[in-house]
């Protein structure tokens, strides 16, 4: 399972959707990344493959960052990748 996580302006918690296949996750990551590069505010709608019916709409002008990572059973889902202030 792959997680695509979005950091939003003025929001301390990221939002995320999940994809089962790496190719699908990579395609979604590239779609969000290109929306960030364009800089034109538009509505981006995402859906989650793990939680059926979970849909997310976000205004691209409120996106700050996007990251993709593999969610493994071994990690327990407690520590996300990236920078952390916790020791």
UniProtKB/Swiss-Prot annotation:
Belongs to the UPF0367 family. It comes from the Bacteria. This is UPF0367 protein SynWH7803_2240. It comes from Synechococcus sp. (strain WH7803).
């Amino acid at each position: 399972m792959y997680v695509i996580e979005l950091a939003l302006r003025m929001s301390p918690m990221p939002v995320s959707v999940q994809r089962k296949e790496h190719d699908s996750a990579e395609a979604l990551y590239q779609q969000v990344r290109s929306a960030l590069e364009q800089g034109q505010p538009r509505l981006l709608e995402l859906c989650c493959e793990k939680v059926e019916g979970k849909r997310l709409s976000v205004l691209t002008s409120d996106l700050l960052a996007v990251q993709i990572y593999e969610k493994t059973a071994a990690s327990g889902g407690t520590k996300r990748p990236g920078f952390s202030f916790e020791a």
